Design a protein with these regions (language model features):
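S1/OB-fold single-stranded RNA-binding interface
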Residues: 1, 17, 36-92
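Basic helix-extension-helix modules of the SAP/HeH family
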Residues: 1-38
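Residue-level signature of catalytic and energy-coupling elements of molecular machines
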Residues: 6, 26, 55, 74, ...
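Glycine/charge-rich, flexible interdomain linkers and switch-proximal surface loops
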Residues: 38-53, 95, 99-116, 250
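Phosphate-interacting basic helix/loop segments used at nucleotide- and nucleic-acid interfaces
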Residues: 39-43, 144-148, 233-238, 287
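Short, charged beta-turn/beta-strand-edge "cap" motif at the junction between a beta-strand
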Residues: 77, 93-99, 167-168
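P-loop NTP-binding catalytic core
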Residues: 83-85, 96-163
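P-loop NTPase catalytic core
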Residues: 168-172, 176-392
Length: 392
């Protein structure tokens, strides 16, 4: 519902000064007005299950940030219907009583768009067998340098794709262009670029041209918020893959995520180089391992950045810890820019490249040739087979 539609609904329900309220306050006022009239109303949100067993329906438009318009979900409902973090849940809710702060879910009407009783016996995502990536990500429309990097290291659905970049090496521009190409060429996939702990002025730049596909936390947010945002998006991606869909989450960056987790997780007693707790690394590795192509379902693809040559010990530790874990790596070289990133072709690779191209012999030959024969216009608009043919 757009802000104007929300205001119109609020005014129709008799909410005072509706156009002066923030969106979260307006949503809460509309829910309360509905509840006052009928005793109960309906709500839908993305479930976050907390450590004590209860949960809340979060607002996706608010990037899952905790708010006063969240709906409380009891532990008994979560157990009964086998609900998990990331599920889209719809149901009947009631207004908070005097001693309560939140609306409460009375009845679960649907989970992931289906009847709630279909879900208690779902197989756990992490327990499902994974297969090799066989569907190539289509990057037509991306800048020529990105298309040529794709020639050397094709990317596939269900992969763990690591983008290593030095400071000011064009990483931010690359991520934006990459996400735009994924959104344009994979309309049925759920594509989200999530940037955490960024400068406030960067937040608006990242979202330009990517409405609905960007989630951001800024350096003004606490570390727990950075962690929660990334985890919610990855868990939402798992639920999408479980029902046969495809989700692509682009994370900027794993280094900042490790720093945030280092401040959030209980100390394990094992501190590594750079004052990084071993428990924080475990959390990053567990999340990174989530990417996969399910044999009998969809795929969760993770694309993540890692800063190199930054002088920060945490970045060095993460590079060591994640060595050999990526399905593909794109490595940026110094001297690039947001408009024209430069790739270290020798270090850029894809472990499953041969499964992602139709003519393996032609691809091998093309990848060994100089790229000067491909014009920028052709690189940006051609599909991968055409690029291979141009260099064959």
């Amino acid at each position: 519902m757009s802000p104007d539609e929300l205001c119109a609904t609020a005014e129709r329900l008799g909410v005072d000064d509706a156009r002066e309220l923030r969106k979260s306050e307006l949503v809460l006022a509309v829910l309360e007005a509905h509840a006052d009239r009928r005793g109960e109303t309906h709500a839908e949100g993305v479930l976050e299950v907390l450590g004590d067993g209860f949960g809340f329906l979060r607002n996706a438009d608010a990037m899952f940030a905790p708010g006063t318009d969240d709906v409380y979900v009891s532990p008994s409902q979560i157990r009964r219907f086998g609900l998990r973090t990331g599920d889209i849940v719809r149901g009947t809710v009631r207004a908070p009583k005097e001693s309560e702060r939140y609306f409460a879910l009375l009845r679960v009407e649907s989970v992931e768009g289906g009847a709630p009783d279909q879900h208690p016996h779902r197989d756990d995502f992490d327990a499902r067998p994974a297969g090799p990536a066989t569907t190539r990500l289509d990057l037509r429309g991306a800048p020529p340098s990105v298309r040529l990097a794709e020639l050397y290291a094709p990317l596939g659905l269900g992969q763990r794709i690591l983008i290593k970049a030095p400071p000011r090496g064009g990483k931010s521009g690359l991520l934006g262009e990459l996400t735009r190409a994924l959104v344009a060429n994979h309309p049925t996939a759920h594509v989200t670029l999530v940037a955490i702990d960024v400068r406030p002025e960067e937040a608006g730049e990242l979202g330009r041209g990517l409405d609905g596909h960007v989630a951001v936390s800024t350096l003004a947010d606490p570390p727990a918020r950075h962690v929660q945002l990334v985890e919610m998006l990855v868990e939402r991606g798992k639920r999408t893959a479980e029902r046969g869909g495809h989700a692509i989450v682009v994370i900027d960056s794993l280094g900042r995520l490790a720093r945030a987790w280092n401040l959030v997780v209980p100390a394990s007693g094992r501190t590594l180089i750079g004052a990084l707790d071993a428990a924080a690394i475990t959390r990053v590795r567990r999340l990174w391992a989530s990417a996969r192509q399910l044999e009998s379902g969809g795929a969760l693809t993770l694309v993540a950045t890692l800063t190199t040559e930054s002088g920060q010990r945490i970045d060095e530790v993460m590079a060591d810890e994640l060595a050999e874990t990526a399905s593909a790596e794109w490595v940026l070289a110094k001297g690039g820019s947001a408009e024209a990133p430069r790739f270290d072709v020798d270090a850029t690779f894809s472990r499953q490249a041969e499964a992602l191209v139709d003519d393996v012999a032609a691809w091998r030959h093309a990848a060994a040739q100089p790229v000067a024969r491909v014009t920028p216009a052709a690189a940006a608009t051609a599909d991968l087979p055409s690029l291979i043919a141009a260099l064959a």
